[in-house]
Each structure stands twice: as C-alpha cells, then as structure tokens.
Amino acid sequence: METPIADFVRRYADSGMVRAHMPGHKGKPFLGCEALDITEIQGADSLYEAEGIIRRSESYAGELFGSGRTVYSTEGSSQCIRAMLYLALTCGNGSRTVVAARNVHRVFVYAAALLDFEIVWLWPERSSSLCGCPVSPDTLERTLATLPAPPAAVYLTSPDYLGGMADISAVAEVCRKHGTLLAVDNAHGAYLRFLEPSCHPLELGADLCCDSAHKTLPVLTGGAYLHINRAASASLRESAKTAMAMFGSTSPSYLTLASLDLCNRYLADGYRDRLREMCGRLEEARKALTAAGWQVEPSDPLRLTVKAPAGMTGGQLANRLRESGVECEYADLDFLVLMLTPENRAADIERLLHAFGTNDAVYAPQPTLPLARGERVCSVREALFAPRETVPAARSLGRVCGAPTVGCPPAIPIAVSGERIGPEALELFRRYGVKQVEVLR
C-alpha cells in the first residue's frame, strides 16, 4: 500500500532545500526527528482542505476500516469527540439533546457545553468501578421512550478503560428504531476492525466512531481517526472536515500524520495474523494468571485487567510490577490495567507473568459503588461559564459542581458541571482521593 505522506516528508528531508518556513528548528537535530517535522509547504497538502497526499492517505485508511469516510486527527480522539457532537448537531434530527452513558471522557462534557447540548445520562444498574458503565439495550429503550423527541445522538464509550465492551449491535438497532444517531468513543479499540470476526463499532452499526490509533496501533501520540459509516447520510461524510477544523489546530503535526500514513501499510501487510497471534498469547496469559491465584476480569482482547486482592490496591500491585520492570497503563484502588499489542514480544509477556508471581491472598466481594446522581441545578454550559472557585472536596457538600470531577478519563464523573454535590459524591471523592473540586461561587 502506498504511503504518500511519509514518502513526501522523507523526500523533502533529503532534498537539501533551504527551510525559509516554519518550524523554527529548520530540520536541525535536537530530539532527532526534526528533519521530518514540516509544515504545509508546497505539495504537503493541508489537513482540513485535503486534496492531495493527505486525501489519498485518508482514503486508504477508509478502505482498511470499511468506512464511508475516514479523516485523520493529530489531536487524539478528543478532537474527534468534539467533531462527532458537532456533526450530530448540524447533520442530525435538529435536537439539542444527547443521551450518553455516564462513563464519558471529560472532553465530551466540555464539547456538550460548547455546543449547548442538554445531556440525558444513562446509568448502570450497578457498578463496581467508575471506569465502567454497562448499559443494556432495554435501559436505552426505556430512556428514549421517556423523551418528548428523539435525541440528536446516543453516545457510548466502548471499550471502557477496564476493557468492558457494549452490545453495539443491539444498541444500534434501538437507535435506528428511534431515528437517532449512534456515536461511539472507540478510542481504545482501533484494532477491533482486524479481529475475525470484526467487532469494530462501524461494523456493528455505529454511525460515527472515533479511534485513538496511537493507543493500540504503531502511531505517534495524538494520531486518531474519525470514521463515518458507509450507510450514514451524505451530509455527515461531507461535513467531516468542517467538524474537525472547528476544534483542531491549524498546525497539525506532520510527524503524527506520517505515522498514521505508515500505519496503513502496517495494517494491510499481515496485521491480522500478528494480531491473532498476540490475542492467543494474551489468552494463555489470562489462564496462567488465573492459575497463579489472580482474578482476571473480562476485557477486550488486547487488555489484561486484574483485580487487586484483599489487602492490596491496584496501585500497590502496579508498584510491584514496576519494581520488576513492567509499567502498567492504569491502576486504582481495585484494578490494574495492562495494554499490549503485537509490538510486544513474547518475552514481554513472560516477564509480566514473572512480575505478578503467585497470589495467595483471598478476594473479597467487590462492593457496589454509591453512584452520585446529583440534583441538576443548571445546565452544563451555564455552570462551565459561570464564576467558580476551588474548595476542599470534604467541604463541598451542597455546592454546585463547576468542572466535571473524575477519578480517571474516561470514567463516570463523580459530579458533572451544574449538579449539586451530595453525600454520595463526598464518599466517592474520599474513596478516589479527590482533594479539591471546582464549585460555583
């Protein structure tokens, strides 16, 4: 597969041209990658008005992902999430309401405020972690049935930070029935397209989807995709670049663009086989950890989510692994998360298993968290643009939340802008070590 962006950048780096243009390093080595770090010079195309090498590269990515249109982001899925909400607003059914599973990335809350959306939250029936918000199609059906009109979109995060995956197919069917778009934050699941069978949200019926390529594919940090489904309206496909330009920098990283471009060749050249092999290794690792006394939680195939046993936190377990030369993705009171890809060697997994060792401690039942369904005092937008102050979390009871407070992104916010902070929120602040919160004055 051609790599037009990477090829252009390399040719320019070797050309000996006098760089009388940005950036200021002029290709001289400071970190070592500067020769390949260029700007929108003649022939380099322009990310938001792509007609040349970027357009060609994005079309190759669209073919690989089976989308109606795929566009690049150099600012992660954060930019794509904002763009998805903009598209739902401008190309949807005219509603200014969005229905969202509560475990959103905070950028969703900020985007909803900027676009003046009202948010109707979907809550889990029970939850043992703020990272997960399993929502059944029946729960969504009941929620949509109570609304006076269909929302602009239903928004889900899948996989979540612990690797939990939503039933996208069933949720998409409910969305079609009610005439609303389905947008999925698939930041942690770009690779899902290449499983057999594919379980990528586009394949399962999502209208809009964002993938953080950099999280699970060999792409530099910030590289991401916004995908539009083939069956989606033409207006969604045609407006994708406008939506991205609304929220993106006019100085996109060509290093990141080149890495997205090279990733197309990587995906086309035997990636499915390498992915299948790694998924098999990780399944064997799950069995080995279970046999060694560890409780391994269900998750997407490239993630190991291990519950901390009684007397130990996930953070302490992470320290134990770190001392053996293994750095994890995430740890909290209850869980440890490790993310691996085909770029990890078999020796990495052996080292990881050795670092875990054997667990002889018992596992206590996981308590159900007291989810804080705070009283809505004002809209998210009103709260975020109102004067605020920072107060100790322990003294915030009864105050109105100014900025969304989360233990980690993406996760169920303990309190969202415009909600009154109640006793349950205080308990969660204490549990997750939140010391300060922003509240309205």
Describe each region flagged by the PLM.
Residues 2-10, 76-295, 308:
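Conserved PLP-enzyme active-site core in the AAT-like
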Residues 68-70, 95-98, 414:
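Short active-site oxyanion
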Residues 287-434:
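Conserved C-terminal alpha-helix-loop-beta "cap" of PLP-dependent enzymes
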Residues 1-52, 180:
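N-terminal "arm"/small-domain region of PLP-dependent enzymes with the aminotransferase-like
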Residues 116, 434-441:
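Short, compositionally biased
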Residues 72, 121-123, 211, 330, ...:
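Structural signal for conserved beta-strand scaffold positions within catalytic alpha/beta enzyme cores
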Residues 34-79, 103:
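Conserved N-terminal alpha-helix of the aminotransferase class I/II PLP-enzyme fold
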Residues 44, 71-73, 154-157, 337-341:
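Short glycine-rich or small-residue beta-strand-to-loop segments that form or flank ligand, phosphate
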